[in-house]
């Protein structure tokens, strides 16, 4: 196990900057997830840590040692790629031991390591089979096992579940989380799927356009996003945004007004808010309430109703919304597309964003954060 530290790390291809001034502290034994939309630089950053890409500027440390000029094979990292890259003509044992054999490791040590990894990954009974005889989930476990036998200080996983179907993704999420708990090693995991990030990570790094947008525990990012990008990216369905007028401002609360005239106080830091300006109010679909229970009410026309059994997702078109508003109702709601519908907004669950995207600090204390 070892810590990973990045100081002002930049990566460019010619004049195109991919990773921009990245500062990160990853503790020894921590499970960290890099998440963000396609093209945000998360895989590039992972490859820089692995040594597969040169760092243009800045410093990378593992423990106390600067690693910028250290060869990938000597960094003590193991990488699991999106593609399994298994040798089709070799059985599982030979696939998992291939790197050790190239390194001319002792035969007894090779068998010991492969058997141990196979036991952890529940592959012991499959070691004589070839990859074509395995399911997608089993192949991914073999790819992880091939990295595991090298006994790296840091595991790097680059979207390892993206080739699996939905059911297998859930299963493998659990398997990887169990593996981390059992090994206690440092893991850095890349995904574009914020559900994977929320369910697996101890710490999430949200990347946007090459910059680190926010770093924190999953619930911290969910309840207290520092900007509108993080607020909209973390959570599924994503946060609703509504344009509001600032009516009054106090130190620990701000009074906002909708276009329909409804106004109410939101418990946020008002130190940088100006009376009379327009801002963006955010509210998560699952935090909306029946109209009679809200501090304010918004009316809209139902566009689509998605009945999932355990919940109903109601898509509304409203005058004030930056997009369609989504309301998640527990259980089944007996409503139809085309109907007029009202939803309640609880003040304590609201977020408030400046025009540059920065969030006002929420003052309501959420459970678990």
Swiss-Prot record:
PROSITE patterns: ABC_TRANSPORTER_1, ABC_TRANSPORTER_2, MALK. Its EC number is 7.5.2.1. It is a peripheral membrane protein. It is an enzyme of class 7 (translocase). GO terms for molecular function: ABC-type maltose transporter activity; ATP binding; ATP hydrolysis activity. Pfam families: ABC_tran, TOBE_2. ATP binds at residues 36-43. InterPro entries: AAA+_ATPase, ABC_transporter-like_ATP-bd, ABC_transporter-like_CS, ABC_transpr_MalK-like, ABC_transpr_MalK/UgpC-like, Mo/tungstate-bd_C_term_dom, NA-bd_OB-fold, P-loop_NTPase. GO terms for cellular component: ATP-binding cassette (ABC) transporter complex, substrate-binding subunit-containing; maltose transport complex. The lineage of its organism: Bacteria, Pseudomonadati, Pseudomonadota, Gammaproteobacteria, Vibrionales. It is found in: Cell inner membrane. Keywords: ATP-binding, Cell inner membrane, Cell membrane, Membrane, Nucleotide-binding, Sugar transport, Translocase, Transport. Residues 4-234 form the ABC transporter domain. The gene is malK. SUPFAM superfamilies: MOP-like, P-loop containing nucleoside triphosphate hydrolases. It catalyses: D-maltose(out) + ATP + H2O = D-maltose(in) + ADP + phosphate + H(+). The complex is composed of two ATP-binding proteins (MalK), two transmembrane proteins (MalG and MalK) and a solute-binding protein (MalE). The keyword Cell membrane applies. Part of the ABC transporter complex MalEFGK involved in maltose/maltodextrin import. Responsible for energy coupling to the transport system. This is Maltose/maltodextrin import ATP-binding protein MalK. Belongs to the ABC transporter superfamily. Maltooligosaccharide importer (TC 3.A.1.1.1) family. It comes from Aliivibrio fischeri (strain ATCC 700601 / ES114).
